[in-house]
């Protein structure tokens, strides 16, 4: 619930939702969020990991009785995130046009897609939005700026266009 600065849980067939995190007004306190954009569940720690966009941070928030979150990554323009089978976190940094992988305990992360400035070359991203990681640790990134989806095989220096890349439109290649 981005504009209400909170994460809601809606159970199947429920008539109302429950506030899980935030809900204390917009702000930068440990009990607040500011325009959260994405959230995933970390099953190992039974917590939520949230892209707290306007606070430029990623926070971990306990799912049970959590009244505040813990900043796990600072100074990042996070718009999307996912986690692989090993518990590594992949975060889209919109401001740097890159995706970084953070293994548990890491604070800097490793660039796994983009990281060469904004652009349309195969080693660049332009306004990346969403990220997905498959079982082979290939990273898929959707780009708003290039109207394409890129696949970056683990260890690759450049990606492969797997969808779009032909400009905006409703054609089968767009």
Give, region by region, the residue ranges found by the protein language model.
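Beta-propeller domains
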Residues: 1-21
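Short loop/turn segments immediately following the C-termini of beta-strands
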Residues: 2, 12, 44, 53, ...
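Structural signal for beta-propeller blades
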Residues: 5-8, 56-59, 97-99, 109, ...
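Hydrophobic/aromatic beta-strand positions that recur at structurally equivalent sites within the blades
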Residues: 10, 41, 60-62, 102, ...
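Gly/Pro-rich loop segments of beta-rich domains
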Residues: 14-37, 64-77, 106-129, 155-174
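Structural WD40 beta-propeller signal
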Residues: 42-44, 84-86, 134
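Conserved beta-propeller blade signature
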Residues: 47-49, 88-91, 139-141
């Amino acid at each position: 619930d981005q504009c209400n600065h909170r994460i809601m849980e809606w159970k199947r067939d429920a008539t109302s939702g429950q506030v899980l995190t935030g809900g204390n007004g917009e702000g930068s306190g440990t009990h607040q969020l500011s325009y959260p954009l994405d959230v995933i569940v970390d099953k190992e720690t039974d917590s939520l990991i949230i892209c707290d966009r306007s606070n430029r941070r990623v926070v971990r928030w306990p799912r049970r009785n959590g009244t505040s979150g813990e900043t796990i990554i600072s100074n990042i323009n996070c718009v999307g995130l996912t986690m692989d089978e090993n518990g590594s976190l992949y975060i889209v940094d919109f401001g740097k046009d890159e995706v970084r992988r953070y293994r548990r305990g890491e604070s800097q992360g490793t660039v796994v897609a983009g990281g060469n400035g904004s652009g349309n070359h195969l080693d660049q991203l332009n306004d990346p939005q969403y990220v997905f990681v498959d079982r082979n640790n290939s990273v898929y990134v959707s780009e708003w700026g290039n109207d394409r989806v890129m696949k970056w095989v683990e260890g690759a220096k450049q990606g492969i266009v797997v969808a779009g890349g032909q400009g905006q439109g409703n054609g089968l290649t767009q």
